């Protein structure tokens, strides 16, 4: 492992793995810091408690002022800076403002490259076949058998022609019969070997694609939410389906065909020299130009294949989004507009396909012409050699067949190379997804003792911007305390960041600075999976999966396999959902459709509440859970919510009086800060308070000499 030089700079996020290292000696060259993992660990082990400010390890205490000054400014909120003693001044200008002006963002996938591993992409492709090496080795063995038998045929057929061409003896018929019988058996063995080869390659290919898709899906689900903010769903689906299939073919069927073509070409060339060295030298002079053409064509095809896969991903994304929102399209009558948009995307794909077709036509046309010229040159030169008695008719026939096989094999190698380049083009993005490390830890960190766990929450001096919109500040010095077992309501104007509070509590994002704590522990120190297992959420528009009602409710349990039907039904009863569920023809086995489209808003809400009940969380987050419901459904849902909130730490994000008035504490959020706090009654007593104005806008308050609270009228 190469250690960084004294002029090297390392940026480490305040939470998460090391990101980038930059060395001024090589200008803008970027390394992933994972290459220096042991050194990174040594550095980070010397840094004290996370979140306590930037601290340099003792060996680097003499760091000059440039980096030190930047470290104590806004940059310290984002990264730790570790540098050699001569790194500061050349780099200071690059580090002003954002966390790293001269360093590319790992989350920007358009710039991000896969981690350097010391292997080429070809070796990465071959690395996929390692788990199947047993079957593939057997397939290669059968490939060798079938190739040897195939390439021995011209030699023996040439001998048969010589036997037929010369004057036959008395035993001519018997000899010919025996020779043909032996060759028939040999050819049958070759056919069997080839069939077994194809089966082993096909089955191995399917296993590789299956494993590749599973690994890719697992890697995608482990990424932080900010990754999905920047990456389109349709693109990920295309990588998961089309690219994996293309890559799988490249390392199995295509690799098998390439090995076969290479073996046959090698044996064929050897036999051509065995039959007639002078004729072989004359004929094979055309191979180098074809090889150069194949390399140029392959490189062009690789770039074109990547562009084609990207264009296909864009078309898939558009189709997936539009089909998923067909009701909105139908409501606005925009069917033909969307057809035109999709047609434009597939037309781009067609243009790329036409470019590929033109390139293939030129290359394979040139390869075919070369093959025909080879045959013609063999006939011409071979005829001259026969005329001078240097070749027999059988030898010329054998040579022609070998030349034919070599020509086919060269064509097969050309196809192999072009398909390999396609696989590499598709594999580039797959390697990025497979090797991408999430910025937030997935399943590591501290777990609190269940016996002492209370569920007290606190935001302290939180500053936050969404990674996809770093220029828009959401929170500025935001602080809020939610005692254990209390019910806190958070209200504020639209866009003030109320739902962002839920995202931070679930640790879907980390704050730029400040802390979010649970029972006094910074949640960035806690295991995210454990943390989320203790939090239940019910949102304004809950998302259900396209499966049965029972499966959707059971989804809230920690262990799906241990959930009983009685537990599901009990949760549904407490959530006021059992009655309408049992009215369905299939009851709890009723499939709810994509995103629960076959259910009403109130029904989806109550199923979501049942799902949260089955989870039995210590902390409950309600995000506008009743705002989109009519009066009847709101009453049923609110009744279920009241049962759900018993004995839990609850944060309610709402503007409906029925939801807010029973809260122990109300906090008003505006411009990224808590501007008012107190009980519902206390806040209403402030004549110019924002809370009172919000209540007026929602028609909760009327002035008739006395204050009365009225529910807003609904159409």
From Swiss-Prot:
<feature type="topological domain" description="Mitochondrial matrix">
    <location>
        <begin position="299"/>
        <end position="357"/>
    </location>
</feature>
<feature type="binding site">
    <location>
        <position position="499"/>
    </location>
    <ligand>
        <name>ATP</name>
    </ligand>
</feature>
<dbReference type="GO" id="GO:0042802">
    <property type="term" value="F:identical protein binding"/>
</dbReference>
<dbReference type="InterPro" id="IPR017871">
    <property type="entry name" value="ABC_transporter-like_CS"/>
</dbReference>
<dbReference type="GO" id="GO:0048821">
    <property type="term" value="P:erythrocyte development"/>
</dbReference>
<feature type="modified residue" description="N6-acetyllysine">
    <location>
        <position position="230"/>
    </location>
</feature>
<dbReference type="GO" id="GO:0006783">
    <property type="term" value="P:heme biosynthetic process"/>
</dbReference>
<keyword id="KW-0813">Transport</keyword>
<dbReference type="GO" id="GO:0005739">
    <property type="term" value="C:mitochondrion"/>
</dbReference>
<feature type="transmembrane region" description="Helical">
    <location>
        <begin position="179"/>
        <end position="201"/>
    </location>
</feature>
<dbReference type="GO" id="GO:0140359">
    <property type="term" value="F:ABC-type transporter activity"/>
</dbReference>
<comment type="similarity">
    <text>Belongs to the ABC transporter superfamily. ABCB family. Mitochondrial peptide exporter (TC 3.A.1.212) subfamily.</text>
</comment>
<comment type="subunit">
    <text>Homodimer or homooligomer. Interacts with PAAT; this interaction regulates ABCB10. Interacts with SLC25A37; this interaction stabilizes SLC25A37 and enhances the function of SLC25A37 to import mitochondrial iron during erythroid differentiation. Interacts with FECH; this interaction may allow the formation of the oligomeric complex with SLC25A37. Forms a complex with ABCB7 and FECH, where a dimeric FECH bridges ABCB7 and ABCB10 homodimers; this complex may be required for cellular iron homeostasis, mitochondrial function and heme biosynthesis.</text>
</comment>
<dbReference type="GO" id="GO:0045648">
    <property type="term" value="P:positive regulation of erythrocyte differentiation"/>
</dbReference>
<feature type="transit peptide" description="Mitochondrion">
    <location>
        <begin position="1"/>
        <end position="82"/>
    </location>
</feature>
<dbReference type="InterPro" id="IPR003593">
    <property type="entry name" value="AAA+_ATPase"/>
</dbReference>
<keyword id="KW-0007">Acetylation</keyword>
<dbReference type="GO" id="GO:0046872">
    <property type="term" value="F:metal ion binding"/>
</dbReference>
<dbReference type="GO" id="GO:0034514">
    <property type="term" value="P:mitochondrial unfolded protein response"/>
</dbReference>
<keyword id="KW-1133">Transmembrane helix</keyword>
<keyword id="KW-0809">Transit peptide</keyword>
<keyword id="KW-0496">Mitochondrion</keyword>
<keyword id="KW-0067">ATP-binding</keyword>
<keyword id="KW-0472">Membrane</keyword>
<feature type="topological domain" description="Mitochondrial intermembrane">
    <location>
        <begin position="382"/>
        <end position="395"/>
    </location>
</feature>
<feature type="transmembrane region" description="Helical">
    <location>
        <begin position="396"/>
        <end position="417"/>
    </location>
</feature>
<keyword id="KW-1278">Translocase</keyword>
<feature type="topological domain" description="Mitochondrial matrix">
    <location>
        <begin position="202"/>
        <end position="252"/>
    </location>
</feature>
<dbReference type="GO" id="GO:0005524">
    <property type="term" value="F:ATP binding"/>
</dbReference>
<dbReference type="InterPro" id="IPR036640">
    <property type="entry name" value="ABC1_TM_sf"/>
</dbReference>
<dbReference type="GO" id="GO:0042803">
    <property type="term" value="F:protein homodimerization activity"/>
</dbReference>
<feature type="binding site">
    <location>
        <position position="500"/>
    </location>
    <ligand>
        <name>ATP</name>
    </ligand>
</feature>
<dbReference type="InterPro" id="IPR039421">
    <property type="entry name" value="Type_1_exporter"/>
</dbReference>
<dbReference type="GO" id="GO:0005743">
    <property type="term" value="C:mitochondrial inner membrane"/>
</dbReference>
<feature type="binding site">
    <location>
        <position position="495"/>
    </location>
    <ligand>
        <name>ATP</name>
    </ligand>
</feature>
<keyword id="KW-0318">Glutathionylation</keyword>
<keyword id="KW-0547">Nucleotide-binding</keyword>
<feature type="transmembrane region" description="Helical">
    <location>
        <begin position="279"/>
        <end position="298"/>
    </location>
</feature>
<feature type="topological domain" description="Mitochondrial matrix">
    <location>
        <begin position="83"/>
        <end position="133"/>
    </location>
</feature>
<feature type="binding site">
    <location>
        <position position="623"/>
    </location>
    <ligand>
        <name>Mg(2+)</name>
    </ligand>
</feature>
<dbReference type="GO" id="GO:0170037">
    <property type="term" value="P:export from the mitochondrion"/>
</dbReference>
<dbReference type="InterPro" id="IPR011527">
    <property type="entry name" value="ABC1_TM_dom"/>
</dbReference>
């Amino acid at each position: 492992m190469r250690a960084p030089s004294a002029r090297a700079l390392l940026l480490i996020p305040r939470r998460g793995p090391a990101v980038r290292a930059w060395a001024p000696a090589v200008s803008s060259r970027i390394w992933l810091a994972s290459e220096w993992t042991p050194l990174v660990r040594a550095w980070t082990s010397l840094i004290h408690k996370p979140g306590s400010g930037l601290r340099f390890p003792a060996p680097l205490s003499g760091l000059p002022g440039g980096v030190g000054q930047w470290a104590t400014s806004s940059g310290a909120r984002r990264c730790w800076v570790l540098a050699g003693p001569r790194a500061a001044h050349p780099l200071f200008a690059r580090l002003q403002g954002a966390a790293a002006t001269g360093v590319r963002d790992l989350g920007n996938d358009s710039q991000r490259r896969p981690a350097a591993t010391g292997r080429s992409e070809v070796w990465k492709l071959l690395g996929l076949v390692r788990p199947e090496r047993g079957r593939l080795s057997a397939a290669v063995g059968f490939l060798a058998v079938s190739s040897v038998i195939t390439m021995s045929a011209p030699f023996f057929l040439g001998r048969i022609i010589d036997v037929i061409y010369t004057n036959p003896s008395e035993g001519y018929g018997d000899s010919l019969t025996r020779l043909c019988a032996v060759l028939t058996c040999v050819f049958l063995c070759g056919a069997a070997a080839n069939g077994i080869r194809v089966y082993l390659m096909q089955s191995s290919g399917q296993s590789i694609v299956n494993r590749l898709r599973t690994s890719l899906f697992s890697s995608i689900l482990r990424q932080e939410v900010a990754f999905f903010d920047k990456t389109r769903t349709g693109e990920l689906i295309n990588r998961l389906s089309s690219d994996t299939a293309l890559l799988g073919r490249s390392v199995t069927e295509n690799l098998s065909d390439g090995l076969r073509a290479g073996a046959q070409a090698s044996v064929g060339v050897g036999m051509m020299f065995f039959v007639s060295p002078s004729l072989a030298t004359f004929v094979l002079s055309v191979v180098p130009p074809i090889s150069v053409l194949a390399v140029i064509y392959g490189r062009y095809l690789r770039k074109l294949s990547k562009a084609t896969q990207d264009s296909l991903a864009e078309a898939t994304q558009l189709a997936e989004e539009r089909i998923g929102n067909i009701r909105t399209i139908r409501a606005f009558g925009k069917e033909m507009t969307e057809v035109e948009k999709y047609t434009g995307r597939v037309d781009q794909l067609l243009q790329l396909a036409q470019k590929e077709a033109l390139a293939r036509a030129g290359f394979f046309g040139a390869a075919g012409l070369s093959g025909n010229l080879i045959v013609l040159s063999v006939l011409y030169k071979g005829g001259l050699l026969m005329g001078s008695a240097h070749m027999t008719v059988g030898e010329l026939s054998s040579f022609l067949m070998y030349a034919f096989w070599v020509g086919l094999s060269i064509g097969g190698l050309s196809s192999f190379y072009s398909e390999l380049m396609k696989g590499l083009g598709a594999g580039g993005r797959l390697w990025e997804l497979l090797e991408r490390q999430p910025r937030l830890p997935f399943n590591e960190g501290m777990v609190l003792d269940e016996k002492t766990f209370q569920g007290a929450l606190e935001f302290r001096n939180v500053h936050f911007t969404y990674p996809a919109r770093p220029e828009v500040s959401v929170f500025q010095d935001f602080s809020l305390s939610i005692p254990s077992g209390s019910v806190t309501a958070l209200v504020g104007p639209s866009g003030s960041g109320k739902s962002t509070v839920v995202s931070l509590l679930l640790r879907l994002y980390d704050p730029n600075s400040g802390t979010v704590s649970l029972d006094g522990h910074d949640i960035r120190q806690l295991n995210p999976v454990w943390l989320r297992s203790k939090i239940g959420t019910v949102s304004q528009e809950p998302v259900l999966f396209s499966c049965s009602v029972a499966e959707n409710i059971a989804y809230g349990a920690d262990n799906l396999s241990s959930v009983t039907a009685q537990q599901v039904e009990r949760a549904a009863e407490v959530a006021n959902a059992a009655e309408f569920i049992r009215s369905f023809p299939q009851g709890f086995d009723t499939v709810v459709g994509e995103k629960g489209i076959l259910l009403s808003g109130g029904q989806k809400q109550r199923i979501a509440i049942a799902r949260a009940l089955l989870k039995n969380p210590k902390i409950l987050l309600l995000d506008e859970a009743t705002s989109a419901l009519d009066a009847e459904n709101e009453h049923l849902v609110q009744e279920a919510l009241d049962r759900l909130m018993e004995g839990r730490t609850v944060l309610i994000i709402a503007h409906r009086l029925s939801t807010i008035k029973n809260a122990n504490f109300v906090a008003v959020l505006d411009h990224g800060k808590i501007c008012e706090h107190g009980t519902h009654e206390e806040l209403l007593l402030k004549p110019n308070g924002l809370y009172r104005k919000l209540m007026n806008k929602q028609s909760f308050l009327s002035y008739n000499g006395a204050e009365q609270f009225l529910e807003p009228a609904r159409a």
